[in-house]
Amino acid sequence: RNLRTDYLDMYLLHWRGSIPLEETVEAMEELVKKGKIRSWGVSNLDTSDMKELFSVPNGDHCQVDQVLYHLGSRGIEYDLMPWLEEHQTPVMAYCPLAQAGSLQRSLLKNKEVQKIAKVSGITPMQVLLAFVLRKDQVIAIPRSGRTEHVLQNWAVKDVILTDEEYGALDRAFPAPDHKTYLDIV
């Protein structure tokens, strides 16, 4: 009632918590059955959690895993992203522009990011977002406080970086070659 709607398009379990996944899935499926939600997903679940989720009845009804993902935080590329792709479950990347502060500044000032932005006629922020969106399975939810930024984010749908540009970004910010802890903000 407070939301002034009869249903939600998607309801996310934000943290794993102490409730067994089977009970969580049952509750989500009951909300779908009652028409309160159209779909459900999870947030901040790593590969082992997703495997466990998909092993419970209806766990494979999960529509998305929302995780931290940006050029400076690529740990999900090692095993979570391939697992989700194999199971046709999209990645919803939160903080795809690296939040704010010193990390974001260091990414934006990186010489490769700057060079690609200049050559492509886009902003360094758009380079960061284009990198995250290079795979079809990734949905990005960048924070935008100004109309100008919303429009710049929207324009990234038409940005196509070259293999050489992606390679330069990969060399500047390599994905891990081993399992890492899931980054969380």
Annotated model-derived regions:
Residues 13-185:
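Beta/alpha (TIM)-barrel catalytic core signal, keyed to glycine-rich beta->alpha loops juxtaposed to Asp/Glu
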